[in-house]
């Protein structure tokens, strides 16, 4: 079992409830608390009480849609289920991605009209959660085009792995975000993760092995064939499993283009924590950095 970030002012019982990076395993966690996290609710059940929002400062980062206060002050509506909220966030993300393909600024009025509907009372929260998912899963940052313009665009910001033409999907769309998530899962799970566990996690982000995805196309083919062919991942059958299961490990290209420290920093950014908050992984990443700094033996000399 992996270590969660160190306790910061939490009770001893909290440590017993901690789970690994990729699995939510606390049966006592409230639905409301789980609903308030988009990407992080899949990475870990709870973050330390000093979590500051995705930007690293008190409060949230990114565009704050006009009318947020009015929306928060709107008359209360009956509680929505976890499934309803996640579907609405997924719908908003899909709407923003489709609009961005035409490179036309996205108007807040269109978002409210075509997506939000009766969810106006929680629009600020839906907007924030959609922005987080866009950034950490797809590598896009949702920004307001001009102050108080109520018009938004998506910009590509996630490039932790050296990306080339091979790293782009059929439509020329970056797949770095998905790759980094899979690499993070592998590292945080002890450098190996079962395929079934990986898909259990990715489903929570709206990425399914059997469904066509707007950005990633065929996710199963992308992960188990394309990333493997590009040598970012190793994909092996686990012996003596019934039903048959497979596992993922980092491939040699990943070790050349990125590092455990860079991937750990990506995970820490998602949690809004410091890489040192995962002592075991941080020590492993440091050792990897030291090993990389040592002079490496030269390769075989070309034959004459």
Curated annotation (Swiss-Prot):
Question: Could you tell me which SMART domains the record lists for this protein?
Answer: MAGE
Q: Tell me where in this chain the PTM Phosphoserine is found.
A: 57, 60, 64
Protein name per its UniProtKB record: Non-structural maintenance of chromosomes element 3 homolog
Disease note: Lung disease, immunodeficiency, and chromosome breakage syndrome: An autosomal recessive chromosome breakage syndrome associated with severe, fatal lung disease in early childhood, following viral pneumonia. LICS is characterized by combined T and B-cell immunodeficiency. Some patients may have mild dysmorphic features.
Start and end residues of each stretch annotated as Interaction with NSMCE1: 78-304
Name where it's found: Cytoplasm; Nucleus; Chromosome, Telomere
Q: Which organism is it from?
A: Homo sapiens
Coarsely, its chief localization is: cytoplasm
GO annotation (BP), single: cellular response to radiation
Gene name tied to this protein: NSMCE3
Summary of the function given for this chain in its UniProt record: Component of the SMC5-SMC6 complex, a complex involved in repair of DNA double-strand breaks by homologous recombination. The complex may promote sister chromatid homologous recombination by recruiting the SMC1-SMC3 cohesin complex to double-strand breaks. The complex is required for telomere maintenance via recombination in ALT (alternative lengthening of telomeres) cell lines and mediates sumoylation of shelterin complex (telosome) components which is proposed to lead to shelterin complex disassembly in ALT-associated PML bodies (APBs). In vitro enhances ubiquitin ligase activity of NSMCE1.
């Amino acid at each position: 079992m992996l270590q969660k970030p160190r306790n910061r002012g939490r009770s001893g019982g909290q440590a017993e409830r901690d789970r690994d990076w990729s699995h939510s395993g606390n049966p006592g966690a409230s639905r409301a608390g789980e609903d308030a996290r988009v990407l992080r609710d899949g990475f870990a059940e709870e973050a330390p009480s000093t979590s500051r929002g995705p930007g690293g400062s008190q409060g949230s980062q990114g565009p704050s849609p006009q009318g947020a206060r009015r929306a928060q002050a709107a008359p209360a509506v009956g509680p929505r289920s976890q499934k309803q909220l996640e579907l609405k966030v997924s719908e908003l993300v899909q709407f923003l991605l489709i609009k961005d393909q035409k490179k036309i600024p996205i108007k807040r009025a269109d978002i409210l009209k075509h997506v939000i509907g009766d969810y106006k009372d929680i629009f600020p929260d839906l907007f924030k959660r959609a922005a987080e998912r866009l950034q950490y899963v797809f590598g896009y940052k949702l920004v307001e085009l001009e102050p108080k313009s109520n018009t938004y665009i998506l910009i590509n910001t996630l490039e932790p792995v050296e990306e080339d033409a091979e790293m782009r999907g059929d439509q020329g769309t970056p797949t770095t975000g998905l790759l980094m998530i899979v690499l993070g899962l592998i590292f945080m799970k002890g450098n190996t993760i079962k395929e079934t566990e990986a898909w259990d996690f990715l489903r929570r982000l709206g990425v399914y092995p059997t469904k066509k995805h707007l950005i990633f196309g065929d996710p199963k083919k992308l992960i188990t064939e394309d990333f493997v062919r590009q040598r970012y991942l190793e994909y092996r059958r686990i012996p003596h499993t019934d039903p048959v299961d497979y596992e993922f490990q980092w491939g040699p290209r990943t070790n050349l283009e990125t590092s455990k420290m860079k991937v750990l920093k990506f995970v820490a950014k998602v949690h809004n924590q410091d890489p040192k908050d995962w002592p075991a992984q941080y020590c492993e990443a440091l050792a990897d950095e030291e090993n990389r700094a040592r002079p490496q033996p030269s390769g075989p000399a070309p034959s004459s």
